[in-house]
């Protein structure tokens, strides 16, 4: 699709002051931001944390993670999708496909191309098909609306229960259709209704069987036929007639034929029953509701519940406003609030699903979720603990009611610790919360024998615990040994934080000591770029001898390697709870700064061509904090320089506007923090100070609290901090604490300039796991 044509759809006609809560901030949201070039964002229609994400499914021969691709053929329009994920697709179920003319075989290839660029705006999606059909979409929390305009002639809608997003990567992660049923009824007022269910398994998280129920209506009279395929995957039809129902492990569905060129369908979903699916659509999209009214409902929900949480009167730069509000939008597409729709257990606790993934989101996304959505955040914490109660482990990732996978540590521990140290109490049972964390820290999860890594569990928990507990390091008998070790250390620091808060001194001492065990992977003899000492692998031989390692290479960087998806030099900066020790091991502050500077030097990496071959990778979460670590060495100006350069170079309000996979909003959350001028250290109350993008920002913290940030002398070439006042008091530290500006609200008043200034002469940021920190 032509990028400029796609982008222009969301450009606002004008820019007004954003100081009013009544301002339609949705005008600045580009649902298409990040939906191309590997960002994998979902450009369809959804509510914040909504179950339904109604959008197109396209086939290109490669994986369509959100259903959408900018090229290829439409194969359906489905109610369930993810956003910003990778690995393999999930969902793409409860689908309809409009077809003109006569449908002789509904299981044949019905795919069709675009006739023009899709139209997107918050709350609305439109596709123009090359066969003359126009598809317009709207959504509520548990239901969706399809509005079709057909050319003259017979008009059909095909409902294929077996429809699901496929995977083409050859890793055994493709979703499978396991069977389903469909029944067609005519209501008392003459409206056509269909309902049924489909069951599926596998997908990105290797899930067992799960079932979704559906209930759909059409606003026009229709003739119908149900169909039955020969098997679960083929195109051979063995039944295609006016039977009112089909139920089989083979492909089933129905074709509805209309005499009208305008047809509207309302479809609800549930994970409990078809009856509940009907109740959901009847409640949320009642008969007679118009698409434009539904669009306004969606816009209002996003405006009032999400976008208005950050406001500004600095409206001179539309690009910055689009980046701000598009990032807020995509950052909160998932997780999904499935409270009331959990088929596995009954509980008074909330239930959240579609957690992609804590190893990506714990650094910057979940801390931002806490600030902007405190009620949702508390519910989310309660849901994680409840999953542990009923399933034995908290998830590091979860979808379709099933934990899986875990790439590194048990990073739900970090999320819980972050909530605890920042005062989340409410209805959270913290004794159970700590017990869930203890399970991660002490119980070896059963090996799920993942062919990508058969050495230990990739489903949940910490599969390499035997080494970690016995040796204080992880040997190469376990895959991803080094990247696991640095994350396990952070996880144990999380336990220390909660244990300390619960006055469990024995546990606190134990896990603080264990959190320092990342040091056992610091190989003082590894050298690169004239620096010595990096995180390295250790063999399973007695004594854990060092294994030779190039600090600038992670080999395959995949499930079976010592480092997952990041270089040794990147992971060597990731002891964020113990940075003072890291600075010392690196040779002191000057050497530490020199190491950081090397990360941003073009041409030092054989990879990362899109980033100038730098070792720093803005599209990869282990690099997220790296630009801000200068604050620990007295060079806050370089934190501003490097983080601002990355943000402005690699983010844009366009389909290719992300530096990599969105990772369920992790990328967008990194940008949002940079725009605010802070960076969180998860599991601590510390926020590193950078430089804000707007002359003023007001962050609504809930409960009448707000953080107000101002920036005097801000310009495109004037963004270095000259001075800072916090709550009206001159400030000389390159960090603030939760209690300073978030717990009760506060103010941060920056004075900026075009050149660095030595303003941050006070205490360095805390390093709580360091003996001298």
Give residue ranges: language-model regions.
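Accessory carbohydrate-recognition regions in carbohydrate-active enzymes
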Residues: 18-366, 370-378, 382-414, 420-486, ...
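Fungal secretory targeting signals
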Residues: 1-22
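Short aromatic-glycine motifs in intrinsically disordered, low-complexity regions
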Residues: 707-715
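TPR repeat positional signature
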Residues: 491-492
